[in-house]
Amino acid sequence: MLCNFNLQAKVVLQPLVLFQIIDSYERRPKDATQIIGTLLGRSNGKEITITNCFTVLHKEHPDSARIDLDLGYANDMLELNQLTYPQEKVLGWFSTGKSVSRSALLLHDYYSRECSDGQPLHLLVDATLKGQRLSTRLYCGVEMGVPGGTKGLMFSLVPLEMASDSAEMVALRLMQKQNLQPGAKQVGRILPELVQVVEATRELQLRLDLVLRYINDVLARKRRPDNVVGRALHDTLTSVPLVDTDNFKLMFNANVRDMLMAITLSTMIKTQLQISEKLFAMPDH
């Protein structure tokens, strides 16, 4: 018998969740073989979006499937998250490893009570980066058995999609660019925001030059026209609102001022955190 989870529902995972899991895995205690945490996100019935997560302290028992969770810590973290992101709800749990662990049944039982629909998702992440790839698999529990007889639980794979917004795509492209550079041994300092804007503008200019060259070649009968390309160009041009030069300059300058203000505030906060960290680390006399 299937639980009340729609296997046809679309599940979307945001990259920030994977970075949080990897960061927690790298900071795990030396005696810990895996990390476990709570998945948070939104669901509208047709699409489930995993947007956030936090690690839950636990103690493993290698000789059995028993696992002890710090429920007080988990509840406190959930309450703090609800204060900041009240729209996020518990969707399930994540763990690291190559396969579903023996403690998954107990974790499924716990998160079944925490989820509003009673059917948690299980995200399994292989953080060992075997083959230079991060393996991610998503499961949901499916009850199996005969009516009136013994029942069991089977974890069935669920299709998982990756999605990111424009801001995350900028960061992902930057990391990909750094990773693809030959001879790059370590990640360098991230370029200032204005430099990134200049680089993005230069790349946009190159693409516009390519489009104009194609159009001119078609008009000069140097290249055979392609209906698919023509429709794509038409859809792109009609989707861009017509803005005169003066209004565009005002909009661009306003966005630049907002960005400079955000840079200033983030720099001040970063400096304050660094000072607080140093003061906290100073020995008491």
Swiss-Prot record:
Residues 11-145 form the MPN domain. GO terms for cellular component: eukaryotic 43S preinitiation complex; eukaryotic 48S preinitiation complex; eukaryotic translation initiation factor 3 complex, eIF3m. Gene3D superfamilies: Cytidine Deaminase, domain 2 (3.40.140.10). The keyword Nucleus does not apply. Keywords: Cytoplasm, Initiation factor, Protein biosynthesis. The keyword Protein biosynthesis applies. InterPro entries: eIF3f (IPR027531), EIF3F/CSN6-like_C (IPR024969), JAMM/MPN+_dom (IPR000555), MPN (IPR037518). Pfam families: JAB, MitMem_reg. Signal peptide: none annotated. It is found in: Cytoplasm. Component of the eukaryotic translation initiation factor 3 (eIF-3) complex, which is involved in protein synthesis of a specialized repertoire of mRNAs and, together with other initiation factors, stimulates binding of mRNA and methionyl-tRNAi to the 40S ribosome. The eIF-3 complex specifically targets and initiates translation of a subset of mRNAs involved in cell proliferation. Component of the eukaryotic translation initiation factor 3 (eIF-3) complex. The eIF-3 complex interacts with pix. Belongs to the eIF-3 subunit F family. HAMAP family: eIF3f (MF_03005). This is Eukaryotic translation initiation factor 3 subunit F-2. It comes from Drosophila ananassae.
